[in-house]
Amino acid sequence: MISSKMMSSNPEEDPLDTFLQYIEDMGMKAYDGLVIQNASDIARENDRLRNETNLAYLKEKNEKRRRQEEAIKRIGGEVGRGHEGSYVGKHFRMGFMTMPAPQDRLPHPCSSGFSVRSQSLHSVGGTDDDSSCGSRRQPPPKPKRDPSTKLSTSSETVSSTAASKSGKTPERTEASAKPRPHSDEYSKKIPPPKPKRNPNTQLSTSFDETYIKKHGPRRTSLPRDSSLSQMGSPAGDPEEEEPVYIEMVGNILRDFRKEDDDQSEAVYEEMKYPIFDDLGQDAKCDFDHHSCSSQCATPTVPDLDFAKASVPCPPKGLLCDIPPPFPNLLSHRPPLLVFPPAPVHCSPNSDESPLTPLEVTKLPVLENVSYMKQPAGASPSTLPSHVPGHAKLEKEQAAALGPASATPALSSSPPPPSTLYRTQSPHGYPKSHSTSPSPVSMGRSLTPLSLKRPPPYDAVHSGSLSRSSPSVPHSTPRPVSQDGAKMVNAAVNTYGAAPGGSRSRTPTSPLEELTSLFSSGRSLLRKSSSGRRSKEPAEKSTEELKVRSHSTEPLPKLDNKERGHHGASSSREPVKAQEWDGTPGTPVVTSRLGRCSVSPTLLAGNHSSEPKVSCKLGRSASTSGVPPPSVTPLRQSSDLQQSQVPSSLANRD
């Protein structure tokens, strides 16, 4: 303001004002310069101080480094490893130098330990250090023990053992005896237990007899596992303790598994045998359930197989009842033990069919009966068709099993038919015999239970026999096994003998009437067959078969030679069978023999004699040549029956 006033008032004062302004500006510049210089000085001072401090720190660091390096070098020289110094140097560089250096440096033993590790890693041999290291490294074997304990877990054990092995291999190589024995024992023990444990797991999956086996291996594996867990303690102690530990665990596992197994087995058995038990109870034909079950086990299998082949033949009563519970199983007849009855129906027909065929020509009544039986059970064609498959299966099985096994198979499948007849028809074999037949036969006999209406069933038997006789000849191939054939002949003889006795036994009047008819027919047949036999039994059989044969199924026909053979064999066998039974039912026997169905009586009643008869029969059957599968079963049965009847008559004479 002053300057402005001055300027405004006195223009002369302008230079003064300018001067003052100039001075002010110069002062400001000087001040700014000083401030800047001061700041720069301060900065420089700070930098210098900083540098000095940094230098001092760096010097200290350098000194420390030198000290550490010197110490490391001294340690390395003392240890006597030139490269060790370099290694230590590396170690220091890697880690905080101060920390590792003093550790390595100060405790010589520790340093030696480090050196030992380096040695082991480098595979440097130092016996003293190695021994000390080995002692120290025994802990790694402890980890192995842990894996061994984990071996029970199996998966962890394997991984841990593998890792421990890989980590400790160098140690083992370098370590003295201690690490090795532990490692070896562990490795040895561990691998065997693993296999055993694996079987145990499998056994657990299939807890059957395997479950028992499982526990045995488990015990062994468990002791090993326990030993592994106890490896820390002396080897001897863990081994001693192992058995106890194993026993405890094994027993517990067994108990639990046993309970489970029992339950599962119980269910399984129920599935298996309930039908037979029910049949046995319903039939109450003096069949022992025990015998049935015991026999069932063996014969049932062949029966089931046969049943499969015979599935075409619908079971008369039992199978029909079973299907609802197991609709799908019907297609799979073998699984159901009940199905054996289906073959039984066919075979029973075959058992009686010889009589009916012989008498059918003479006895129209019987033929009517056969018609009746067909509706009752299944169409004769079904039965014959069923029988051929059955016969084939039995032949194959008999051949494979051999005479001895063939006999059981025959007894299991063919005998049941006879059993059924015995229990329900005048022919009915002795009950004791029926009981003896395998459970399958019992099941079959029981199957007729639905047929149990004695009059219709008996009538059906007589009639169906005539019709099923065609199928029955096929059943003969079924026994085709030599044993089977012989047994069939013997059974036929016994069967023939049985009719009279069975008549008295069986209270069913229709059966008795049928038997009387059969006997009359037999006598007629014997006479006629003796005459015919001289002529041509084969031709007559074919005619009778045509007349009688309801089954259109082509069944293996017996060549005339085979027929003659069969007749001859049957003639020999009937006599033997008669001797066996001690009954003169030869004609009946021959007819049945023609069918070659094994009567359970023979099988059950005469076990000792059966083998012989079966062998002979087996030959006769083989010689007789199971009918080739072309001729109707009726044809075969008629031919066989005719040939056999003459032979039986000749034997009687």
Curated annotation (Swiss-Prot):
<dbReference type="GO" id="GO:0048812">
    <property type="term" value="P:neuron projection morphogenesis"/>
</dbReference>
<keyword id="KW-0597">Phosphoprotein</keyword>
<feature type="modified residue" description="Phosphoserine">
    <location>
        <position position="120"/>
    </location>
</feature>
<feature type="compositionally biased region" description="Basic and acidic residues">
    <location>
        <begin position="168"/>
        <end position="188"/>
    </location>
</feature>
<dbReference type="Pfam" id="PF15439">
    <property type="entry name" value="NYAP_N"/>
</dbReference>
<comment type="similarity">
    <text>Belongs to the NYAP family.</text>
</comment>
<feature type="modified residue" description="Phosphoserine">
    <location>
        <position position="206"/>
    </location>
</feature>
<feature type="compositionally biased region" description="Low complexity">
    <location>
        <begin position="519"/>
        <end position="528"/>
    </location>
</feature>
<keyword id="KW-0488">Methylation</keyword>
<dbReference type="InterPro" id="IPR029353">
    <property type="entry name" value="NYAP_C"/>
</dbReference>
<comment type="subunit">
    <text>Interacts with ACOT9, ARHGAP26 and PIK3R2. Interacts with components of the WAVE1 complex, CYFIP1 and NCKAP1; this interaction mediates PI3K-WAVE1 association and actin cytoskeleton remodeling.</text>
</comment>
<feature type="compositionally biased region" description="Basic and acidic residues">
    <location>
        <begin position="533"/>
        <end position="562"/>
    </location>
</feature>
<dbReference type="InterPro" id="IPR026722">
    <property type="entry name" value="NYAP1/NYAP2"/>
</dbReference>
<feature type="compositionally biased region" description="Low complexity">
    <location>
        <begin position="398"/>
        <end position="412"/>
    </location>
</feature>
<feature type="region of interest" description="Disordered">
    <location>
        <begin position="99"/>
        <end position="243"/>
    </location>
</feature>
<feature type="modified residue" description="Phosphoserine">
    <location>
        <position position="434"/>
    </location>
</feature>
<dbReference type="Pfam" id="PF15452">
    <property type="entry name" value="NYAP_C"/>
</dbReference>
<dbReference type="InterPro" id="IPR039482">
    <property type="entry name" value="NYAP_N"/>
</dbReference>
<feature type="modified residue" description="Phosphotyrosine">
    <location>
        <position position="268"/>
    </location>
</feature>
<feature type="compositionally biased region" description="Polar residues">
    <location>
        <begin position="223"/>
        <end position="232"/>
    </location>
</feature>
<feature type="region of interest" description="Involved in CYFIP1- and NCKAP1-binding">
    <location>
        <begin position="150"/>
        <end position="161"/>
    </location>
</feature>
<feature type="region of interest" description="Disordered">
    <location>
        <begin position="373"/>
        <end position="653"/>
    </location>
</feature>
<feature type="compositionally biased region" description="Low complexity">
    <location>
        <begin position="461"/>
        <end position="481"/>
    </location>
</feature>
<protein>
    <recommendedName>
        <fullName>Neuronal tyrosine-phosphorylated phosphoinositide-3-kinase adapter 2</fullName>
    </recommendedName>
</protein>
<dbReference type="GO" id="GO:0043491">
    <property type="term" value="P:phosphatidylinositol 3-kinase/protein kinase B signal transduction"/>
</dbReference>
<feature type="compositionally biased region" description="Polar residues">
    <location>
        <begin position="198"/>
        <end position="208"/>
    </location>
</feature>
<feature type="compositionally biased region" description="Low complexity">
    <location>
        <begin position="149"/>
        <end position="166"/>
    </location>
</feature>
<comment type="function">
    <text>Activates PI3K and concomitantly recruits the WAVE1 complex to the close vicinity of PI3K and regulates neuronal morphogenesis.</text>
</comment>
<feature type="compositionally biased region" description="Polar residues">
    <location>
        <begin position="112"/>
        <end position="122"/>
    </location>
</feature>
<feature type="modified residue" description="Omega-N-methylarginine">
    <location>
        <position position="81"/>
    </location>
</feature>
<feature type="compositionally biased region" description="Polar residues">
    <location>
        <begin position="421"/>
        <end position="439"/>
    </location>
</feature>
<feature type="compositionally biased region" description="Polar residues">
    <location>
        <begin position="634"/>
        <end position="653"/>
    </location>
</feature>
